[in-house]
Design a protein with these regions (language model features):
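Beta-strand elements of well-folded, non-transmembrane domains
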Residues: 10-14, 34, 60
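Short, charge-patterned binding micro-sites
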Residues: 3, 41-62, 91
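C-terminal binding/interaction regions
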Residues: 21
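C-terminal structural segments of small proteins and small subunits
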Residues: 58-93
Length: 93
């Protein structure tokens, strides 16, 4: 069994309040959960209105499949005009 964990550090430059940031992040997490069927959560910078750290987990018996899925998620996030990827990390367990 392969577990892939993707963490993504984001900047939300258009956000002027926590409410603005949460709207962007909640929408992004919902879209990703529905499109890719992965576990997703905001894990850090909860009280910052311009930063967010998200984590995604995918389980499979094929590491190539997990890697491909998490790469697609990262590309999807990068294509979102409301946030910018500052850093990302991919780990396999």
């Amino acid at each position: 069994m392969i577990v892939g964990i993707l963490t993504v550090d984001l900047s939300v430059p258009g956000s002027n309040s926590l409410k603005d940031k949460r709207q962007v992040i909640k929408s992004l997490l919902t879209l990703i959960r529905n499109k890719f069927n992965v576990s997703a959560a905001e894990i850090d910078h909860l009280d910052s209105h311009r930063r967010a750290e998200l984590a995604f987990a995918c389980v499979s018996n094929d590491q190539a499949l997990v890697n491909k899925m998490l790469d697609k998620i990262l590309d999807f996030i990068r294509s979102n005009p409301l946030c910018e990827v500052v850093d990302s990390d991919l780990q396999f367990v």
